[in-house]
Each structure stands twice: as C-alpha cells, then as structure tokens.
Amino acid sequence: MAKRIIYPLYQLGNPQLRIFRPTFNMTLVRPGKEQPPDTVQFRISMAMTKCDVRNYLEKIYSVPVSAVRTRIQYCSNKKRNHLNQRVKRPDYKVAYVQLAQQQTFQFPDIFPEKDKKSKEGSVEEMHEKFMEDERQRQKPDPRRGGVTEWFGL
C-alpha cells in the first residue's frame, strides 16, 4: 500500500504495539456536476489503487463501501512563467466512492445565507434608497398620456 514502509526499531518487551500510518492522503472534494446522493468524490494520491481506497475508508473510518471508480485528471501546460517557460500543473487522481447499505452523503453548508436585514445608516441601505429614487425619477410621467419626453415643451 505505501511506497516504503519504515518499521520502528525493535525494543525489548512484549507486546510490540504497531501503529500503521499510511503515507497517502485523501481529500474530500465538492463535485462539479450533480452526483447521486450515495456517491462521494475524493482527490487521492497517484500511487493509490481502488483496493487502497476501499481499505482506507473501511478500516480507518469504518465507512462501508460498495464500489470504487478512479480516473486520472491530466492537467494542462498552457500557462507560462515569467521566463516564458511552460509550467505544467501536476496531474492527480480522482476516486468516486459509492457508499453501501443505502447510505447517503450531503456536503455540509459551511457558509449559510445570511438575512438581508441591513443596519440603519449602512451603505447597503443608502444604496437601496438611491436606487429607489432613481427608479422613481426614470418612470414616465402618467400625465403625458404615453407621449415620449422627446416631444417636450
């Protein structure tokens, strides 16, 4: 699973408790397109396999996994640096994990919409008042009977 496993030095005494810490990282990503509620998208290391992703989630986080699909996202090299050399962003692997047993996942709403109540004397209130005055001023005069202002007196 890991590229190179470094075991701790042997020390006298039993039992030897071994803690396995994987060198991989998985980043939970908000999907760009709408996905089923039981599918979760991760950005993973290029060295990880489908079995690694499944074991990572099931053994460490106790999340039941039904299926894992992966793809490699190749990044472009169209950007140029200050020396006019092409700069390529690193490629990454994306894993789509389908949860088992009718489980669903919904991204938490970290930044909820705040109420539109503005404070008295605030910039937003002054802007709204100005815009309302402009709308009133630009309304056609009802006494003119539909004649445009171009035919003014």
Curated annotation (Swiss-Prot):
Residues 110-153 are annotated as: Disordered. It is found in: Mitochondrion. GO terms for cellular component: mitochondrial large ribosomal subunit. One of its GO terms (biological process) is mitochondrial translation. Keywords: Mitochondrion, Ribonucleoprotein, Ribosomal protein. Residues 111-146 have a biased composition (Basic and acidic residues). InterPro entries: Nucleotide-bd_a/b_plait_sf (IPR012677), Ribosomal_uL23-like (IPR013025), Ribosomal_uL23/eL15/eS24_sf (IPR012678). GO terms for molecular function: structural constituent of ribosome. Component of the mitochondrial ribosome large subunit (39S) which comprises a 16S rRNA and about 50 distinct proteins. Belongs to the universal ribosomal protein uL23 family. This is Large ribosomal subunit protein uL23m. It comes from Danio rerio (Zebrafish).
